[in-house]
Every structure is written in C-alpha cells, then in structure tokens.
Design a protein with these regions (language model features):
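Phosphate-end processing signature that detects enzymes handling 5′-triphosphorylated RNA
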Residues: 1-226
Length: 226
C-alpha cells in the first residue's frame, strides 16, 4: 500500500476557558460579521500514539499514531514533529507527514516497512539504529479522544477556514492518568494573501483575550501533563 504524502495547512490552536459561553460568543461575534459561517456538524476521533516507553521516536522528531474518525475510517500517520525540527537537520523540502488508510482492527505493527520508508524519506542516513527493532518495542503510550463541532468560515477576500471547537481528553495508556481540555482549532484551507490568516489569528486573540494560544502539539501537551 502506497504512502500518501501530505503538507500541513496553517493553523492556530487555543485553550478555551469556558466552552459553553465562549463558543457561541465567537461564532456570533463581530469578528465573523464579514464571513459566511456554515455548520459542518459534529465528529469524534481517537488518536493512539505508539512509541517505546522512553519515547525514542518522539525524541527524534517522529510521531507515529493511528487516527479513527467516527469509529470507522482509520489511518496510520507518520508525522514529523515541528517542535523537534530546530534540533534536527531535516531536509528543507520534507513533507509534514505521511498517512496510510488501514483497517479498523489494524495497528502500526502490520506496517513496519511503510513506517521505515517514511522515516528514510526524511532521514536518508537513517537513525543510526536498527529501526525495525525499535518499532517492535513500540506500544500505545498516549491516547487522545476528541469530540468536535466544526464550522466553515469564508469571506469574499479569499480567506477560507475551518473553526473547530474540541473537547480533548488525553490519557496515558500505561499510567492510566487522564485530563481534558476544551480547545479551538482554526485551520486555513485557502487564502490569497497569507498575511490575511495571520491577521485573523491576531484579531481572535485581541477580541477574545481569555483564549490562550497552545504552542505545543497534542503529544507534547499529553507528555507534559500526564
């Protein structure tokens, strides 16, 4: 099965203090008066991050996880962690991540060859270890369960976004600890002038100072809090 190479869309993630109050306030705000806002409905997805107990791959800037959407469609994802890029000499033209559709009952362990291929596309010299040996030591470490309500937001200048309000529950599979966070995820689907999206994100914070920008990705958030 062939890996699908994907480039990340620009986005901003924010911690919400009070989902019940802040979600309707944002959707009905003056900020969105010049936008057409359409409901995309609700969804539920579950991510399971696989790694060694000491997070060998995460420390190398590689996140390996499965994501299941609404209990049916499932993908294996090999993502390159942007928080680690500054400390690792990546190829400048690297993809953000690779994905592979898999069956609902499958995990990463059936796809060592595909994972190794994705790693070598970014690390032509490898990781100075036998990668398959480390993959065999991997097991579920972190689980992220996300209840999501999404809206498509479009204006006449070409800015097209998806705003998603999430209840994220993070769980440490081994330690059985868990915590939850309400968040807002804003993804830019298309824009004529990239500065327009940056300005929009700054305006969100200006108009809703109670929002806190999340600088870390989901795996780092989980590792720092569990």
């Amino acid at each position: 099965m062939e890996l699908i190479q994907v480039t990340n869309l620009a986005n901003g993630r924010y911690l919400i203090a009070n989902m019940k109050n802040d979600k309707p306030a944002i959707i009905r705000s003056e900020l969105l008066n010049s936008f057409a806002v359409g409901a995309l409905g609700s969804s539920y997805n579950e991510k399971v991050y696989f790694d060694t107990p000491d997070f060998f791959f995460a420390e190398k800037g590689i996140n390996i996880y499965t994501v299941t959407i609404n209990g049916s469609a499932k993908e294996l994802v090999i993502r390159y962690d942007s928080e680690q890029v500054r400390r690792i000499e990546f190829l400048k033209n690297m993809p953000n991540y690779f994905k592979l559709p898999i069956k609902k009952d499958e995990t990463m362990h059936k796809y060592y060859n595909e994972i190794i291929e994705a790693i070598y596309r970014v690390f032509p010299a490898g990781l100075n270890v036998n990668i398959e040996d480390y993959l065999r030591q991997c097991s579920p470490q972190i689980k992220v369960m996300k209840k999501r309500e999404s809206f498509r937001v479009v204006n006449n200048t070409g800015l097209k976004m998806v705003m998603s309000f999430d209840i994220c529950e993070y769980a440490n599979v081994a330690k059985r600890g868990k915590f939850s966070q309400p968040t807002l995820d804003i993804v830019c689907e298309s824009v004529r002038n990239p500065d327009d999206f940056k300005i929009f994100l700054k305006t969100v914070i200006r108009d809703f100072p109670q929002l806190i920008k999340i600088e870390s990705n989901e795996l780092t958030v989980a590792r720092n809090n569990l």
